[in-house]
Amino acid sequence: MLRIYVDAATKGNPGESGGGIVYLTDQSRQQLHVPLGIVSNHEAEFKVLIEALKKAIANEDNQQTVLLHSDSKIVVQTIEKNYAKNEKYQPYLAEYQQLEKNFPLLLIEWLPESQNKAADMLARQALQKFYPNKK
């Protein structure tokens, strides 16, 4: 089983956003920083999740059960209910649904921020890496 932990950080809302992704199996751990552009905090959470799935597919890690972990209740509830109340999130849900077809079993689980510290740290580092303060 592959566990994927994701989190996003945003400067402003909307603002420059970065994501952190942790891929965890029994044999390995991989950590990534990803730029997410200028989006709202909730959109950043959707975008980092989608990036995590795209990278899993590109690395051929999609031939196993995948458990996604996010501390964003909006993202998790949208995916679990298969419905985006906010129109802004509908394209993200549609993209998730397309990516989901590439996995034999893809599950998502909400977890508290206190249990997602590695992805949170990577997201904050991504902000510094991709959007350094301009002087």
From Swiss-Prot:
Keywords: Cell wall, Hydrolase, Magnesium, Metal-binding, Secreted. Mg(2+) 1 binds at residues 7, 45, 71. Mg(2+) 2 binds at residues 7, 120. Gene3D superfamilies: Ribonuclease H-like superfamily/Ribonuclease H. Residues 1-128 form the RNase H type-1 domain. Belongs to the RNase H family. EbsB subfamily. This is Putative hydrolase EbsB. It comes from Enterococcus faecalis (strain ATCC 700802 / V583).
